[in-house]
Amino acid sequence: MLTKAPRGTKDITPKDAYKWNYVENKFREICSLFGYEEMRTPVFEHTELFKRSVGDTTDIVQKEMYSFTDKGGRDITLKPEGTAGVVRACIENKLYADTQPTKLFYITPCFRYERPQAGRQRQFHQFGIEALGSDKPSLDAEVIALAVQFFTEVGLKDLAVSINSVGCPTCRAEYNARLKEYLDAKSDVLCETCLERKDKNPMRVIDCKNPTCKENLNDIPFMVDHICDDCKDHFEKLQTYLKEMDINFVVDKTIVRGLDYYKKTAFEIISNDIGSQSTVCGGGRYDGLVEQLGGPKGVSGIGFGLGAERLLLTMENNNIEIENPYATDIFIVTIGDEAKTKSFKLLKDLRTNHISAENDHLDRSVKAQFKYSDKINAKFTIVIGDDELANDTATLKNMSTSEQTTIKLSEIVQELKSRL
């Protein structure tokens, strides 16, 4: 067991790490284009933060959090999602007092105790953005546009954007009462989970994946059909802005998201990859969360989160290849101790000039050194032996053409800079 990673975790080895670097750097690039800056928060927070933000009745809080009491008697939780920690940090550091809106992005590991499956791990990696300080639908449109541009630029073409309005406290109270009345009349056909949800958070019943529930609740009332005039105006303007940017979308009345803090806009982005559909992103507006966590009143917010594991799996399913940028430029083959000693100055000169270079550390034969050079896909091999040392030269071999050139050691760096 000591040599096995814990269930639900996965090592990211060099054969995959470059793919992670690619999507992480692309996310940073796109966020920068939209004016978002990076935020880093601790990997663990006080448990109460997630109970108050994510919601006591959610599956995350009730079933999935990694929580413990530390040696100081504090209740601590490894973060199950990124938003709560960023909002907490904004309050603590008074970022809301800076130029509004405050636009942030993050890349972070998260932790949930759930059944591991393809694209879903107990330790997973979340990319996300949070924009605080504006309650306008134009910001909602920007957030969705950022996500769409990111997915498009990593190669996902067949995207489906689904949006919904989950109302505000004003219209939701009346709707929840109506929904609960409807669900009470259907109690005998609800699954066990929905029976619990109908009393604690009735709107979550809409999110049930149980086929029997879906069949028996086909006439369930939806929030978007009962929103107040303010929410309706907000939702209509959002749609106008998305159309202006040529972002295709559908209104999906069943989107409620799994977290309690969402208000007004909720959205998901689905990739129709080969053979199946995959939700690659979800988010929404969380007006009131800042105040709920102890911040000032009236600081609105919106954001989204996406799972890196699921994104990379979706890209793989779409046959999107990511080129490995890490290739060794030079391997130095040395013959004899004196040549090996001489190679270290050359290695330093090459690396100082940002030319990647390696040499042998296992005292291999010349043949084995060439074989290793080929294995690491070195572009050029430099050979230094007794003859070369006597003439202060080296043999430069182009590994793709097998062309060999004798060149002065003092000129080799400049020569390689011109060739690479």
Predicted regions located by residue number:
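TRNA-recognition modules of translation machinery and tRNA-sensing kinases, especially anticodon-binding
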Residues: M1-K367, Y372-L420
